[in-house]
Amino acid sequence: MTAQDQSLAKSFEPAAIEAKWGPEWEKRGIAQPTFDPAKPDFAIQLPPPNVTGTLHMGHAFNQTIMDGLTRHARMLGANTLWVPGTDHAGIATQIVVERQLEAQGVSRHDLGREKFTEKVWAWKEESGSTITRQVRRMGASIDWTREYFTMSPDMSKAVTEVFVRLHEQGLIYRGKRLVNWDPVLGTAVSDLEVDSVEEDGFLWHIRYPLVEADAKGGLTHLTVATTRPETMLGDVAVMVHPEDERYAHLIGKEVELPLTGRRIPVIADEYVDREFGTGVVKVTPAHDFNDYAVGQRHNLPQISILTLDAKITADAPGNYAGQDRYDARKAIVADLEAQGLLVETKKHKLMTPRSERTGSAIEPMLTDQWFVAMSKPAPEGTFYPGRSIAEVALDAVQSGEIKLVPENWNSTYNQWLANIQDWCISRQLWWGHQIPAWYDDAGNCFVARTEEEAQAKAKAAGSTGALRREEDVLDTWFSSALVPFSSLGWPEETPELKHFLPSSVLVTGYDIIFFWVARMVMMTKHFTGQVPFHTVYVHGLVRDSEGKKMSKSEGNTLDPVDLIDGIDLDTLLKKRTTGLRRPKDAPKIEKKTKKEFPEGIPAFGADALRFTFASLATLGRNINFDTGRCEGYRNFCNKLWNATRFVLMNTEGHDCGMGPCNNDCGPDGYLHFSQADRWIVSLLQRVEADVEKGFAEYRFDNIASAIYKFVWDEYCDWYLELAKVQIQTGTEAQQRATRRTLLRVLETVLRLAHPIIPFITEELWQKVAPLAGRAKGDGTESLALQAYPLPAMAKIDEAAEQWVAQLKAVVDACRNLRGEMNISPAQRIPLYAQGDTEFLREASAHIQALAKLSEVRVFEDDATLQAEGAGAPVAIVGGNHLLLKIEIDVAAERVRLSKEIERIGGEIGKCRGKLSNESFVAKAPPAVVAQETQRLSDFEQTLAKLQDQLQRLPA
């Protein structure tokens, strides 16, 4: 491929450019790192998406930021590595395959573990490349030769090694603890996989009779309020606040537990909220996390009354055994009422923990699980003996070894680690890293790297029978926590580990600081003695344009690929209404979609989408995504494309001043730079400084804004117009200088914008760089590997900046006068000017062209100006008096202006009437009131201008 194989197309067509450059970059290996010891190292980890998932807006936003940082570092000359990978995503992937089997009338239990796992592997191979193809569509400059999968042999080896070492160090153990249990999936789940959903429920008030009469208070019973009467079968106490005078004398007494025949004690604990319900709370340690903690403090027994599929256990009292939890609830409430123990039932709003995957209500359940000890001191022989892994991870941030951006996340991170519980790492699934533990017939456990090693350990312990493998698998987050070092070849010593650990920065949403970020710090510090990364850039979450969370059930999700390629309405509707958890939501979603996208979504291209994400990337805040902004940045790409076409048309085949003379050689020399040339170069230095500051501070919104404003507002809207004048009217030396400036500034802009909009900049650079003397022109070079622009502050020219500022003010004043006098843009009229004579004469050609004037006459004194331009509309800009010499019918113009002033006055009266109406202000939506306030302000400004024009008319 050569850069000059065809001229630049007339219009910007992102699909063709993306299809060309994505594969080309990969073929050229631009993302593959060097290992040059003389260069700085830059590494970044891609948060591994689910292998069977698809790209969502959060991924696309996150990858835009990461790619921007990576391309920037590469262009600064660093040894650069962006490590890609996919996660086996235990629960998510298993659910997908189970649903496929369910549609065929088969369950995983029908197949058995081995055949089911084969099915999952087959599904992974079939669909696992979807998300990596989509990541490529975003233009991510990833070294795909290093792509890992968290269950590949190398990664599995690292996982096993970590588990075995932690167990040998006494930091992994098996025990019975309370966990989040999904009864549909039949497994423990992490907090991240649990949604708290506000629901309508009930608060049942139940009598618990006192065993002994209350002689002091005259009470016969205590009334307990609960939202879960079915769990009372597992109550082991009732508790009151120790300072609650109503019940203090009953502490240590007993009550009858209704429907069971058991007696349970009255205990005191400060956990009780005296204001909630009656101030008496039931304690069920086996089925409530808070009660579990109370039970630990008071050494209470634990009675499990639910099976793993959420049915009442076989040894439960009464006829409740075997009933579903909700059926048992109804039966228990009915029996309580029949026995006169139900005081009242009140409607109550409650937060129900529901499984993110199945929607089932989560049960706190006592089960045997594997845990990593968070607070236990590490033994001798580790990097930090005597200190817990949580303590070491906490110190990494507190000491400044790891920097969180923005800093306000430090307190959140610190608070979580300071109050951390042991980490439940086992899951009752079939897909995942099977825990490397084996049991003999007596239940003795042998943790080992292989079955052979386990048998050797068993034999050494005197156990000679067959061993049974632990069926549980590891939490997906366990293997994810190792990727900073496992993806670089650990436990082997590799060049990658030497160069790229710690990585430079981690880019992540705030929602997984605890689940992933903190655990990576723990594991990496414990096993390598190093932090996993120097900086964590914490960004907000992508929401819809109204700030609502994007979810399929709300019908407000957007597929990044649909924004890149476009999608018609029918396909979009089908996509949004298929596979809903609640199919009844489909009509609502269809209506919302038709309103928002009546003609579907147009193709914006990857660059416009990336620019939109960058512009929204404020520190720490959520991102309200609006497709209207995509349209604006697609327009920006068009503007940049058309500007490049203009530059090429005015430079190809011309002497563009790329000879040996780089500096201004004067009017009679080879190059003679105009004020405008020096101004745009000066301004470019300031923009380069702003962009570099933006990268240093992770302010991609500022980077996007600086580039946008410079390209659109300065280079395109002003400099290109000024350059036209200079090329048409300047000397040969001036023309060469202007052509050189056009090319050099544009080429620099393309390098500057490349980390944000890589496709269009690469395509344009291939055409511009050879003319600018920055490339050979044979197509072998890539913009991705060019030097990133850095400011040369010596090139800042404040005099040129002031000169152009004065020019802009004069041109704007002329344009405003034309608008106020309703002069057609096609009508060329003369400008009479007096003031800074030297400036006005030097700038006259530019003023004439940009303000669409027939001529610019400069007068030496104001008296002559007024005499020559009597009755003409006047503007004063700085020290310059400007008159547009036009003939107008003064009487007719006076009538027209008077009528318009009267009309605008009427509109102002209507607006003021509305805004003074208290009922309107109170009842109308805030947006409507704000709109009316803005209308009033606009009308008042228009009125002031009209009155000013009327006063200017000659008598």
Curated annotation (Swiss-Prot):
Residue positions of motif 'HIGH' region: 49-59
GO BP of this protein: valyl-tRNA aminoacylation
Binding site for ATP: K552
Top-level taxonomic group: Bacteria
Motif 'KMSKS' region positions after renumbering to this chain: 549-553
Record has Ribosomal protein as a keyword: no
Enzyme category, top tier: ligase
GO cellular component: cytosol
Keyword Protease annotated: no
InterPro entries found in the cross-reference section: aa-tRNA-synth_I_CS (IPR001412), aa-tRNA-synth_Ia (IPR002300), Anticodon_Ia_Val (IPR033705), M/V/L/I-tRNA-synth_anticd-bd (IPR013155), Rossmann-like_a/b/a_fold (IPR014729), tRNA-bd_arm (IPR010978), tRNAsynth_Ia_anticodon-bd (IPR009080), Val-tRNA_synth_C_sf (IPR037118)
Enzyme Commission identifier(s): 6.1.1.9
GO molecular function: aminoacyl-tRNA deacylase activity; ATP binding; valine-tRNA ligase activity
CDD domains, sorted: Anticodon_Ia_Val, ValRS_core
Keywords tagged on the record: Aminoacyl-tRNA synthetase, ATP-binding, Coiled coil, Cytoplasm, Ligase, Nucleotide-binding, Protein biosynthesis
Cell compartment(s), UniProt: Cytoplasm
Catalysis performed (reactions): tRNA(Val) + L-valine + ATP = L-valyl-tRNA(Val) + AMP + diphosphate
Coiled-coil region list: 926-955
Principal place of residence: cytoplasm
Function: Catalyzes the attachment of valine to tRNA(Val). As ValRS can inadvertently accommodate and process structurally similar amino acids such as threonine, to avoid such errors, it has a 'posttransfer' editing activity that hydrolyzes mischarged Thr-tRNA(Val) in a tRNA-dependent manner.
Domain notes: ValRS has two distinct active sites: one for aminoacylation and one for editing. The misactivated threonine is translocated from the active site to the editing site. The C-terminal coiled-coil domain is crucial for aminoacylation activity.
Family: Belongs to the class-I aminoacyl-tRNA synthetase family. ValS type 1 subfamily.
Subunit: Monomer.
PANTHER family: VALINE--TRNA LIGASE, CHLOROPLASTIC_MITOCHONDRIAL 2, VALYL-TRNA SYNTHETASES
Protein name: Valine--tRNA ligase
Organism name: Cupriavidus pinatubonensis (strain JMP 134 / LMG 1197) (Cupriavidus necator (strain JMP 134))
